[in-house]
């Protein structure tokens, strides 16, 4: 009986943990910008992606492998910013669960103003994805337009964690 009770408690805890991993908060540009600034002296890797973007989906397993390698470093954080529509939030949640995304995922619900906020992230960004931006102390230190290899991602992280 004790074993059964322990098993049930373990299953409940695992289910609760998995539910926490699949929450997606929607934000506007200003909230995302504030979040970037609040990360302080961490190296913040911000990847813009969508579930409908084939190159984005292709690079995510490498991003998760690298995130898992660095996630215990208190000077590192990765955020995946989904550009899917708010009405597709459930699809994003299912995608996170199916792909076992371990980084924090945020849904940027500000598509109508994208011509305003895209140049605030990078003046040369034309809006295509995937895009990965690296920040340290709230300042942009690297911009990568397009798919990023695992090797380039790790190299960029290591260069800026020094």
Each model region followed by its residue ranges:
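Bacterial Sec-dependent N-terminal signal peptides
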Residues: 1-25, 162
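Thiol-/selenol-based redox modules, centered on thioredoxin-like
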Residues: 129-162
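Loop/turn elements at helix/coil->beta-strand transitions in domains of secreted/extracellular proteins
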Residues: 39-44, 74-77, 101-104
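Short, internal strand/loop/helix patches
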Residues: 96-129
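A short beta-strand-turn-helix
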Residues: 23-43
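Structural microenvironment flanking redox-active thiols in thiol-disulfide oxidoreductases
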Residues: 61-99, 113-118
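Short pre-active-site segment immediately N-terminal to redox-active cysteine/selenocysteine motifs
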Residues: 42-44, 49-52, 85, 128
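Conserved redox-active cysteine motifs that mediate thiol-disulfide chemistry
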Residues: 48-62
């Amino acid at each position: 009986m004790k074993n059964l009770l322990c098993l049930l408690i373990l299953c409940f805890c695992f289910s609760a943990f998995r539910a926490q991993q699949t929450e997606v908060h929607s934000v506007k540009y200003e909230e995302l910008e504030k979040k970037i600034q609040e990360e302080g002296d961490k190296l913040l890797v911000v990847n813009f992606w969508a579930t409908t973007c084939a190159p984005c989906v292709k690079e995510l397993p490498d991003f998760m492998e690298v995130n898992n390698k660095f996630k215990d470093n208190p000077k590192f954080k990765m955020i995946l910013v989904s550009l899917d529509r708010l009405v597709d939030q459930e699809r994003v949640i299912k995608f996170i669960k199916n792909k076992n995304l371990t980084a924090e995922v945020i849904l940027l619900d500000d598509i109508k103003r994208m011509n305003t906020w895209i140049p605030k992230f990078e003046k040369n960004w034309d809006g295509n994805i995937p895009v990965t931006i690296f920040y340290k102390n709230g300042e942009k230190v690297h911009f990568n337009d397009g798919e990023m290899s695992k090797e380039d991602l790790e190299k960029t992280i290591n260069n800026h964690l020094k």
